[in-house]
From Swiss-Prot:
Record's keyword terms, sorted: Cytoplasm, GTP-binding, Hydrolase, Magnesium, Metal-binding, Nucleotide-binding
Protein name (record): GTPase Obg
InterPro entries hit by this protein: G_OBG (IPR031167), GTP-bd (IPR006073), GTP-bd_Obg/CgtA (IPR014100), GTP1-OBG_CS (IPR006074), GTP1_OBG_dom (IPR006169), GTP1_OBG_dom_sf (IPR036726), OBG_GTPase (IPR045086), P-loop_NTPase (IPR027417)
Compartments (UniProt record): Cytoplasm
Region (Disordered): 362-390
A molecular function GO annotation: magnesium ion binding
Organism for this UniProt entry: Mannheimia succiniciproducens (strain KCTC 0769BP / MBEL55E)
Purpose of the protein: An essential GTPase which binds GTP, GDP and possibly (p)ppGpp with moderate affinity, with high nucleotide exchange rates and a fairly low GTP hydrolysis rate. Plays a role in control of the cell cycle, stress response, ribosome biogenesis and in those bacteria that undergo differentiation, in morphogenesis control.
PROSITE patterns: G_OBG (PS51710), GTP1_OBG (PS00905), OBG (PS51883)
Amino acid sequence: MKFIDEALIRIEAGDGGNGCVSFRREKYIPKGGPDGGDGGDGGDVYLIADENLNTLIDYRFEKRFAAERGENGRSSNCTGHRGKDITLRVPVGTRAIDNDTKEIIGDLTKNGAKLLVAKGGYHGLGNTRFKSSVNRAPRQKTMGTPGEKRDLQLELMLLADVGMLGLPNAGKSTFIRAVSAAKPKVADYPFTTLVPSLGVARVDANRSFVVADIPGLIEGASEGAGLGIRFLKHLERCRVLIHLVDIAPIDESDPADNIGIIESELFQYSEKLADKPRWLVFNKIDTISDEEAAKRAKDITERLGWEEDYYLISAATGKNIPQLIRDIMDFIEANPREVEEEEKAAEEVKFKWDDYHNEQLSERGFDDEEDWDDDWSEEDDEGVEFIYKP
């Protein structure tokens, strides 16, 4: 199935049903008082994370989703039915963004997580709501409010513990194949990897971590060269980045310069991503002697001023990979995801009609604590005000 990590859809919550103006009319009860019911609320639109999905391709073809409208109120104090909600299933790791305001509505980082993205319109109030000691026969109602409408940008960001960085043909896909059961395409030409992929690296029966491989970066990627830098977003949730470097490039380029290119593109994309823990791993040491590999790695790190540890591996032969995998696992266990990052709630999103009813009732001086008896005297019309509203 084609991997799609971005989609723009139109979502429309249901409109609220209108309130009803009605009066109780029964034999021997000539003035039974108001009995108009409220309308029903409009249906909401939700997103729910589904671990069985791994692409947003479904939303490339069907782009408009609308919830049901609330039913109008009826006489005999009958409230209209609420509109049915709709729930859209998306992959775990999806972020919802309002395309007009660029407001992040929320992230779905756990299977089964549910997110309200468009709130249905509020129901209108029937004339029963406006009865009071001074208004015995109100002819007033409110209309249901329109449901929220949004152009929603969906962005899928893969959930992985380790992210792979490097130029094209640095050996990232070969590394994924070496440490996991994933089988990304491997070939001797640039940009063999066109879409991100995941692999599960298992250290032993009870310990494993997830590795994310993305297409390689080249100089000018931030300006659109190659496949650009848009796939870097898939590394934002990783705990550590593995910068894989070809220690003996076939084009005879300088590995130190290649490292500088990746770091520059990383900083241009996001300083937050650039500040993540980053490990330097020299690959393809099987193409040169061990002594030459050690000498080159030392020279490169000295020129870069790299003071951290680094690794020398061969993804093709598996040399030194078991030790690297164990060290990564130890780092992940020693640095669990921060609680605030794992359970971080999105900033409260203000929906359009949150305060609508309070405003409507306060404008009309309605006190919901007032009680009124239906058996009022026919002659007692003091203070009765008839309000006509279309």
